[in-house]
Swiss-Prot record:
Belongs to the RNA polymerase alpha chain family. One of its GO terms (biological process) is DNA-templated transcription. GO terms for cellular component: chloroplast; DNA-directed RNA polymerase complex; mitochondrion. The keyword Electron transport does not apply. In plastids the minimal PEP RNA polymerase catalytic core is composed of four subunits: alpha, beta, beta', and beta''. When a (nuclear-encoded) sigma factor is associated with the core the holoenzyme is formed, which can initiate transcription. The keyword Chloroplast applies. It comes from Lepidium virginicum (Virginia pepperweed). This is DNA-directed RNA polymerase subunit alpha. It holds the Pfam family RNA_pol_A_bac. It is found in: Plastid, Chloroplast. It catalyses: RNA(n) + a ribonucleoside 5'-triphosphate = RNA(n+1) + diphosphate. Its EC number is 2.7.7.6. The gene is rpoA. The N-terminal domain is essential for RNAP assembly and basal transcription, whereas the C-terminal domain is involved in interaction with transcriptional regulators and with upstream promoter elements. It is an enzyme of class 2 (transferase).
Length: 327
């Protein structure tokens, strides 16, 4: 384990790894700081970085297994201790590292008796196993077992469909997430208007990436998301003759609201509470915190008023209108 004393820069913005350790082959931990930041910046960066770490980084997984001896995934094979389902679950947990794109094939071909572990997987050159000791199956008798595997690189997760069977091959739930967890915390220092912040970022990975590698990749992904905004040319918001500015309304909120009132004028809006509208929990909580309790309260707010609510988005306004128009 490597741990360094935190030294805060008072001028130049800089980041540093202050703690790094490997708890096991499949669990790495890293702790980083970024400072000095102005008030509010640490939370902005921390939230964005956490989402990028958990959702934007690609990983490699086994996504399908095939064997001629398997009638269905809840069956048992004579001479093998584990059920087919247990073998598929064990394959799901194999941690791989690669830079491949697309799909690759791998193979397990073993003669019993004996234990089958990750080191028995015959992999393409572009893929490596993080922990060769990961258990797959136990052969109790002198039988031959061959399993073909499909390996893919992606991000997020992919849940198998129970009816998605191709030529006796079985899909495997895949979690393409090298980062197992990420947290951020904030330390404030200074006085009065000169308060500054330190962002602490903790990252746990499955060993296919180190926390430092994950941080770099998440940062690149965030930068790539914002690059298009740097190339927006001002004239794209004007007509070709540059004489009239084009106004792009988000959507005709006012017109839809007027129509809604006309259609439902017979309703007593003040007696319809927002918890009767079956709104998503986040939208409901945002409205309640802003003292919007009834449909009348809601309709008395303009689009501009609603999007000023903390954690409320323009998409939420549209969703509310869609729900109301269906009532």
């Amino acid at each position: 384990m490597v741990r360094e004393k935190v030294k805060v820069s008072t001028r130049t913005l800089q980041w540093k790894c202050v703690e790094s350790r490997r708890d096991s082959k499949r669990l790495y931990y890293g702790r980083f700081i970024l400072s000095p930041l102005m008030k509010g910046q640490a939370d902005t960066i921390g939230i964005a970085m956490r989402r990028a770490l958990l959702g934007e980084i690609e990983g490699t997984c086994i996504t399908r297994a095939k064997s001629e001896n398997i009638p269905h995934d809840y069956s048992n094979i004579v001479g093998i201790q584990e059920s087919v389902h247990e073998i598929l679950m064990n394959l799901n947990e194999i941690v791989l590292r690669s830079n491949l794109y697309g799909t690759r094939n791998a193979l397990i071909c073993v003669q019993g008796p004996g234990y089958i572990t990750a080191q028995d997987i015959i992999l393409p050159p572009s893929v490596e196993i993080i922990d060769n000791t990961q258990h797959i199956a136990t052969l109790m008798e002198p039988i031959d077992l061959c399993i073909g595997l499909k390996i893919e690189r992606n991000r997020g997760y992919s849940l198998k469909m129970s009816n998605n069977f191709e030529d006796r091959s079985y899909p495997i739930d895949a979690v393409f997430m090298p980062v197992q967890n990420a947290n951020h915390s904030i330390h404030s220092y200074g006085n009065g208007n000169e308060k500054q912040e330190i962002l602490f970022l903790e990252i746990w990975t499955n060993g296919s990436l180190t926390p430092k590698e994950a941080l770099h990749e998440a940062s690149r992904n965030l930068i790539n998301l914002f690059i298009p905004f740097l190339h927006v040319e001002e004239e794209t918001f004007y007509l070709e003759n540059n004489q009239h500015q084009v106004t792009l309304p988000l959507f005709p909120f006012h017109n839809r609201l007027v129509n809604l009132r006309k259609k439902k004028k017979e309703l007593a809006f003040q007696y319809i509470f927002i918890d009767q509208l079956e709104l998503p929990p986040r939208i409901y909580n945002c409205l309640k915190k802003s003292n919007i309790h009834t449909l009348l309260d809601l309709l008395n707010n303009s689009q501009e008023d609603l999007i000023k609510i903390e954690h409320f988005h323009i998409e939420d306004v549209k969703k509310i209108l869609d729900i109301l128009e269906k009532k």
